[in-house]
Design a protein with these regions (language model features):
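Structural motif
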Residues: 61-62
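A short, charged helix-loop
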Residues: 31-36
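Acidic, low-complexity central loop/insert segments
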Residues: 1-30
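Glycine-rich, small/acidic residue-mixed loop/short-helix segments
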Residues: 13, 23, 43, 48-51, ...
Length: 125
């Protein structure tokens, strides 16, 4: 994501799909059709160098540019790792803070690690 390198093929080894997905989760990388109608900033596409602010026109450019220049992003995906390594949170589980305020929800989960879409402003208060 975001870079290209050339390596000799003998340094690579095949890994399972589970290992690949865990790598993505730990690094906050999302994928899938469910992202098609979402704001790229919410899914860290800007942090993964998936948005160019110097190239031509694209659908939603005004919204993306405005969000970038104002620095206002209300929600973002964050990776999480549960302390209890034997537990798991189901997708769409609502996450609440200690005050009971809703912070966001789980969007992907694999064992004790997962991704949550959190209300950035509530989460950082």
């Amino acid at each position: 994501v975001g870079c290209r390198e050339t390596f000799s093929k003998d340094i690579f080894h095949e890994v399972s799909l589970e290992v690949y997905h865990r790598f993505q989760i730990i690094n906050g990388i999302t994928e899938g059709q469910q992202l098609a109608d979402k704001i790229p900033f919410q899914y860290n596409i800007d942090l993964l160098k998936g948005i160019s602010f110097t190239k031509g026109c694209y659908l939603g450019q005004e919204l993306i540019s405005r969000s970038y220049h104002t620095g206002i992003v209300r929600k973002r995906v964050f990776p999480f790792n549960l302390e209890d390594q034997d537990s798991m949170l189901a997708v769409d589980t609502i996450l609440k803070g200690s005050s009971g305020k809703i912070l966001g929800k789980v969007i992907h989960s694999q064992g004790p690690v997962g991704l949550a879409l959190l209300d950035y402003l509530t989460f950082t208060d």
